[in-house]
Amino acid sequence: MMHFNDIDDDQIRLIGEPNKEPRPKRRWWIITAVAVVIATVISVIFLCSQNDCEEMYCENPLFYCEASDGTAYIYDGVAETRGYTLITDTTINDIPLRAYTPYGATMSLHIGALNKNDSTIVYAARAADIRADNGGIVGAFVLNGEPRAWGISKKGYCAAINGKVVIGVAKNTHLFELATEQGGYFFRQYPLVSNGKLIENEPKGKSIRRAICEQQGKIFMVETITRESFHDFAQALVDIGADNAIYLTGSSAYGWAVDQNGIKHEFGEDDYYTGKLKMPKNINYIVWRTRVTP
């Protein structure tokens, strides 16, 4: 009779407690960790959609940021109620620049004095130059479909037709006629950048410089904080990535921008508005107005 302690050479004795069901603690720990990761990702996406992650998509601080689908999202909540201008400062080639990017606004042209209390204006700056001899506008100019001046003394142009702004350089362009036919706007100025290439201009000397620029369809205005030459200013615009740019009347020319907080930022000198100087009858401006009345 074999006892419990007896074992043959061809037998194996198992020592230990009987098998038990595996404990599910490790499995539940993994599930919990995965759930936490998913919740974190969802939270980040939600916060970004609430405008808390602007800098994640901002490669160039001069321009407004875009979400991955290409839609502007910085201060979208503000843009839905009123337009504004995003104001940003940077330095390129030791030249301090200030950029103005309009949101929720449409560009047009204006001749004559502006109403400084007009709450629909989010950006205004002098556009075409004025002749010193007869006070006429230099270069072709179309105001709400009406030609007010003709000529190609300067090859740079800016057109605003049906809400779309086009900046370019050409001796002849169909946009003058198109602006006339469709109630649009058109003016000419010195060309600064064409297809990403610097364009030299004859005027020398240094002054506060301004320009209206386009980069991949985005429109923004830039001014220098210090007095600069045409060449250095144009080079700075090339270096910030402007595809096309033309000049805006600089020096002490008056204008202003309204930021996302409703604060008005004036530049230049308002001598024409205080009566210190007589205002030219053909003084003209580019004007960005909010699409939604405040």
Where does each model-flagged region fall?
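Active-site-adjacent helix-turn-beta-strand microarchitecture at beta-sheet edges
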Residues: 125-126, 131-197
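Short, surface-exposed beta-edge/turn micro-motifs
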Residues: 97, 119-122, 153-156, 163-164, ...
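Conserved beta-alpha junction segments in alpha/beta enzyme cores
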Residues: 187-211, 216
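Secondary-structure transition/turn motif
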Residues: 103, 168-174, 224-227
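Conserved, well-ordered active-site substructure
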Residues: 135-152, 205, 214, 218-244, ...
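Zymogen propeptides
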Residues: 2-150, 222
